[in-house]
Regions:
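Structural alpha/beta surface segment adjacent to cysteine/selenocysteine redox centers
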Residues: 97, 108-179, 208, 212-213
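Sec-dependent signal peptide recognition
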Residues: 2-8
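C-terminal motif of bacterial Sec signal peptides marking the signal peptidase cleavage site
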Residues: 13-16
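Short pre-active-site segment immediately N-terminal to redox-active cysteine/selenocysteine motifs
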Residues: 100-103, 214
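A short beta-strand-turn-helix
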Residues: 76-94, 118-119
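Extracytoplasmic c-type cytochrome modules immediately beyond a signal peptide or single-pass transmembrane anchor
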Residues: 24-78
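The canonical Cys-X-X-Cys-His
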Residues: 104-110, 217-219
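C-terminal cap of thioredoxin/glutaredoxin-like
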Residues: 5, 19-34, 52, 178-244
Length: 244
């Protein structure tokens, strides 16, 4: 806010008079004096800047949403049918795709509801997109989950356990994975790391095309949901089911 006020003052001051050669301190003093003498003009300028910025942000957001919606049809197969991703309830008539990180607070908050939905709604096919954006520990967790998928282990159980773990570190990830029969050497094998990292990069690019720049993000039919709004997720599922 202080920066915006200063910018508004400088713009108005520059419009009111040309700056003569002088020291920065002297110029700053003159700007401050002008601000004190013209509070109403300064307030009006600041409000105008905020209105303009808000309108520009809203316009950019609307354009981004429109582009993401337009991209959905051509990205549908990558979203819902990538054989590298784990899909719970594979025979479900409606597909939900989640982009998430095991250390994302919002992903953690909604995770138990996601697991409950998977268990309560066998008609809902749920695709997991590993998108670790919180650093090396998140990347290790994603690789552990992908190893569970590759080995046919309890993916949903590992997902739930890692989301619930406090704290989640490499040792805890390995413990939880091993408890579900995942081969720990398979997680960090060079070939597995290269394969998984390539998949994660592709997932991030897919999310970018859908204007998903954070986690969690959900796709249900033609609906893109940003954040942990479970009620919106359920509503989108019911809407998609009605169309199926």
């Amino acid at each position: 806010m202080r920066t915006a006020i200063a910018l508004a003052a400088l713009c108005l001051f520059a419009a009111a008079c040309e700056r003569a050669p002088e020291s920065d301190a002297a110029f700053g003093a003159r700007v401050k004096a002008w601000m004190m003498a013209h509070p109403d003009d300064l307030r009006a300028a600041l409000e105008n800047m905020q209105t303009k910025t808000g309108a520009e942000d809203a316009k950019a957001e609307a354009a981004s949403i429109q582009q993401a919606q337009a991209a959905l049809p051509r990205l549908r197969a990558a979203l819902e049918r990538d054989p590298r991703d784990f899909a719970a309830n594979p025979s479900g008539k409606v597909t939900v795709t989640e982009f998430y990180d095991y250390r994302c607070p919002h992903c953690i908050n909604i995770a138990s509801k996601v697991v409950g939905l998977i268990r309560a709604r066998p008609d809902v096919r749920f695709v997991f997109k590993e998108m670790p954006i919180f650093g090396p520990v998140s990347e290790h967790a994603a690789r552990a989950a992908l190893a569970a998928k590759a080995e046919g282990k309890d993916y949903v159980g590992l997902y739930a356990a890692m989301m619930a773990a406090r704290p989640l570190d490499d040792a805890e990830i390995d413990r939880l994975a091993a408890a579900r029969g995942v081969s720990l050497p398979a997680i960090d094998a060079p070939a597995a790391i290269a394969r998984d990292d390539a998949q994660i990069v592709q997932t991030e690019k897919l999310a970018e095309q859908l204007s998903i720049d954070g986690t969690p993000g959900f796709i249900v039919g033609d609906t893109i949901i940003h954040g942990e709004d479970f009620d919106q997720l359920v509503a989108a599922i019911d809407k998609a089911k009605a169309k199926a």
